[in-house]
Structures are given as C-alpha cells and as structure tokens.
Amino acid sequence: MPGGRRGPSRQQLSRSALPSLQTLVGGTCGNGTGLRNRNGSAIGLSAPPITALITPEPVRHCRIPELPVDGGLLFEFLFFIYLLVALFIQYINIYKSVWWYPYNHPASCTSLNFHLIDYHLAAFITVMLARRLVWALISEASQVGTSSVVHYTTLIIGRLVLLTLCGWIFCWTLVNLFRNHSLLNLLFLGYPFGVYVPLCCFHQDNRSQPLPTDCGYLVPDSLVDEGANGAGSLVRPKDFLSLLRESLREQLNSAPSVPSHSCPLSPDLIRNEVECLKSDFNRRIKEVLFNSLFSAYYVAFLPLCFVKSTQYYDMRWSCEHLIMVWINAFVMLSTQLLPPKYCDLLHRSASHLGKWQKLEHGAYSNAPQHIWSENTVWPQGVLVRHSRSLYKAVGPYNVAVPSEVSHARFYFLFHRPLRLLNLLLVIEGSLVLYQLYSLLRAEKWNHTLSIALILFCNYYVLFKLLRDRIVLGRAYSYPFSSYGLKPH
C-alpha cells in the first residue's frame, strides 16, 4: 500500500463541522455531553461555538380585553334561582295531574297533585341548594368595612340570625323526614357527602417535590413551608378531622382571585409555575364537578327516591331532565370558576412550557442528538435523549420534562387559548339545540312548560359564551405587530 500521511476521513470532517450544544440552544448543558453518532455514543466537542445558529423563538402574548364577569354574590343568586326553577319543573314532571277532566275528583281541580308532595323534603332540598348563596351573603357582608361598633354588632347579629334560621329549618325538616320515611330512603339524603369525603378529602397530591415559594397565591403558606423544609420526604398522613376541615374550608371559601403571570425566564421557575397552576386548575375542576353533581342530585334525583310506589311518572323524561340540569350546572360553574382571564393565564404558561414528541428508535439517526438538560431552553425541532428514548421539541419554547405526562397534557389542553371556551360552547349549544328540537316535538303540557323554562336559563349562559368567543377570537387573531409588544 502506498505510504504517506492520510487526510481526515469523511466522518471526522462531518463531526468537526457540527456546532456545539451551546451554539444550538444558546446555553450550556448541565451534564457536559455533546452530540451523538449513529451508534448512540456521546461525542465530546472541545471547539468553541462559532455562532448562534439556532435560538429559541421568543414567546409573545396577546392582550385580551377585560370581559365582564358576574360577581360572586350575583352568580350564586342566579345559580340558586336556576336550581329552584329546575326543582319546580321536576315536581311538575312527577306530580302532574289531568286537570282538564271534569271535577269528579279533588286531584283534577289543580294542575298538580299537591296532596302527594312531601313539603318537608322540598324544604330540605331548598336549604341544601341555598348553602352557597348563604355563605356568599356572609362572605360579602364580612368583607364590608365596619366603621362603627353599631355596624359591627348589626353584622354579627345578622349572621347569627341567618345561620340560626337555616339550621333550624334543616333540623326541623330532618326530624319530620325521619318520622315519615324508612331508613333506606333517608340514606339518600346524605349520599353526596358520603361520596365526597372518601373521593376528595382523602386524595393527597404527591408532595415529594418541594413546592416553590413564588406560588404562595395558590397554596397555603403552611404547605410552602412543608415543601421547603421537607424536600425529598413525603408529607405525613393527616387524620380524618383535619382532612374534613380543609375540605369544608375549600367548599365554603369564595373563589380565589386569578393569579398573575410574570413570564419567568428560568426553566425551573417555569416548571414550578406550571405545577402550581395545574394544582389550582385541578382544584377548580373538582369543585365544578362536585357542585354540579350535587345540584343535579338534589334537584332531579332525590325527589324520585321519595315517590310513592303507587305514583306514576315518566321515568325517561325525568332522567332526561336530570342530565340537562347537570350539564347546564356544569357549564355555569365552569364559566364562573374558569373565566377568560384565567384561561389566558394557563395559555401563557403553556406557551413557556412547550412539549416533546416521542420518536421511534432508529428515527433521525443522522441528525444531531443531545442529552436533555433541565437548565436549558430548547428550541423547536431539536432532538434530545431522555430516559433511553428520543424526543423532538414541538413548541417554539421548550422546558418541559420529556417523560412527564402531566406536562404534555397541560400543553395539549392550554396551548390553544380558546380550547376550553370552544368545548363549553359546543356543549351548551348542543344542549340548546336538543331542547329546541324537543320543544318542537313535545305533545304533553308539562314537557312544553319544562323545556320553555329551562331554555330561558340556558339562553343567558349561551349568550355569555358566544360573547366571550367572538371577542377573544378577534383578540387572539390580531397580529402581534399591531400591539407593539416586546417578546418575553
């Protein structure tokens, strides 16, 4: 073979021409690894970066207008009126009479069989439905500043009178129900509380990770101290009374104020903010689900449990009314607890978080691959390896953990700002269309009356959703250059 000095091979030339990780992502990799070859072995690059070839695209946020939202007391009053209307409709469906017949029977003199209605049960249901309104009244009155001793004394007396009246009616109805009904029927009175305690009170989030101190607006200070002092250790299980007190405090407290978004630059701060918002969103969804099911249970299901065996009613129509009440209560509570400003906050946080797409083994074998680092902001299209898997950056700004399913779920739900609003609009619009169709085909007087009354309530909710969708759709479609915004 001819001698002489050999030149660099094609593989060596290709390796030396590739930029380092600092050049690609505009930062340093915490583990000191560089690119990978086809066999998957790491290649250390000692050459300094030439120029910044790929930089993360800056995150820009749209400015949305301030949309009117019902106050806490006004919403609770409207929600209580809606539940009373739905309860009245269910009693019509159960105890309707043939009032157009000749007056040969006392029951035919009126449109309802009033002698079959249990008024103690109706009073008990009304008290249970009014619990949120009563607490909203007390909370609003407590927030008003007391300028004099007389005003403060009047406030205390008014609260005591209101709570005493509700407690007396509640106990009076319970005593009469215990006298007139069997134990099996009485078990249905507290069934929602029996389900809520094991499902919600005993549910403990995984707090092995330290909670960030900059999210104090979302979690109590005690939990922040526990997360800061007990990093790496699990929280001790709490007793039943402590869990019950915390759960009741969450139910009785008014809805928390919408937190603010600070556009953090550190990947750790972004992930901590996402964890706080995720916990807050789960708590709000839990409150929406419980209160909507609670309302539908006491409005439409509990009256069916106390119907006498000799009483005939349309089971299919009553169950249909139950489903309609639950869906509309769910949408009403969602629009109040998940306002547009809060959804925009979740969208901004998801834009900073980003997402990773898992690739199959052997894909992109010729492309540069890096070891994922938690201190690096990854641009779109970069390939990283994490937990023996290959991932591709999807978002323009990526700090999420590739193997964390909750991060991918958070980005999927909130990276489009109108996704939740569109979902609620589709649900409410479908419900209204179905009710209009049922109204056209209704032949019985109680069906026509019940659908007409419910439609008046649903029109208000649908109007608010359509208004928010039109305004926010134009706001998010407006070009960024027109705002004069600076990228974060």
From Swiss-Prot:
List all membrane-crossing ranges.
72-92, 110-130, 155-175, 182-202, 287-307, 319-339, 420-440, 446-466
Keyword Nucleotide-binding belongs to the record: no
Q: Which residues are glycosylated?
A: 31, 39, 180, 206
What UniProt keywords are attached to this protein's entry? Glycoprotein, Membrane, Transmembrane, Transmembrane helix
Grouped into one coarse class, the protein's main location is membrane
Q: Choose one Gene Ontology CC annotation of this protein and give it.
A: endoplasmic reticulum membrane
| PANTHER family, per database record | FI21814P1, TRANSMEMBRANE PROTEIN 39A
Task: Report the sequence similarity comment from the record.
Answer: Belongs to the TMEM39 family.
- The molecule here is called Transmembrane protein 39A-A
Q: What organism is recorded for this protein?
A: Xenopus laevis (African clawed frog)
